[in-house]
Design a protein with these regions (language model features):
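A generic "folded-domain core" signal
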Residues: 25-172
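N-terminal signal peptide c-region/cleavage motif recognized by signal peptidases
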Residues: 21-23
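Terminal low-complexity, poorly structured segments
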Residues: 15-16, 25
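Acidic/proline-rich low-complexity IDRs
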Residues: 2, 18-19, 159
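Bacterial N-terminal signal peptides that target proteins for export
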Residues: 1-13
């Protein structure tokens, strides 16, 4: 399945889980557990078509930046063999042509924007980002809003290693 199709399905399900503002269809997605700062959700299919982990920022700067609804996701698509696909909901559309970065310690990754969302460009970079997240303590996502303001959302990575294990055992 193409990335665009998976993303469309994923965000439809995230809406259903009440993670994004829109009418909910709670029977499609359910929260299984929370592990420190991460929550695990799955669809209702057996075997699962998808599962995802999500977390909200612990800090947003500037405080009035308007990144309302920001979230980081790690999605799994068992039928397509996708075990850990990272993405970010920024909570605002980015300034055209601006760069989005995800930083964990000294490592930095460039993301691309699609409206209010950001993705890693290729599978190799996805794996490197997820591995850095598993080993790190915080993730800082920086993007530029349409007015030119640089916005940074900082996420805790506490519990992600255990949450990833739970994601894999639940979804695969």
């Amino acid at each position: 399945m193409a990335l665009c199709q998976r993303v469309t399905i994923f965000f439809s399900c995230a809406v259903a889980a009440g993670l994004l503002a829109a009418p909910a269809y709670a029977q499609d997605v359910s929260k299984l557990t929370s592990i420190v700062d991460w929550s695990l959700y799955t669809d209702s299919e057996k075997p699962h078509a998808f599962c995802f982990l999500t977390s909200t920022p612990k800090l947003s700067t500037p405080a009035n930046a308007g990144s309302d609804g920001a979230r980081v996701y790690i999605s799994a698509w068992p039928k397509e063999g996708v075990k850990a696909e990272p993405s970010v909901r920024l909570g605002f559309a980015t300034k055209k042509g601006s760069e989005i970065t995800a930083a964990i310690g000294a490592q930095s990754f460039t993301l691309f924007a699609d409206k209010e969302r950001a993705y890693v460009a290729d599978a190799t970079s996805e794996l490197k980002l997820v591995e850095a997240m598993r080993k790190g303590s915080k993730l800082a996502v920086t993007a530029t809003d349409p007015s030119g303001t640089s916005v940074t959302d900082t996420y805790s990575l506490a519990g992600l290693g255990q949450a990833m294990q739970e994601l894999q055992s639940t979804c695969f």
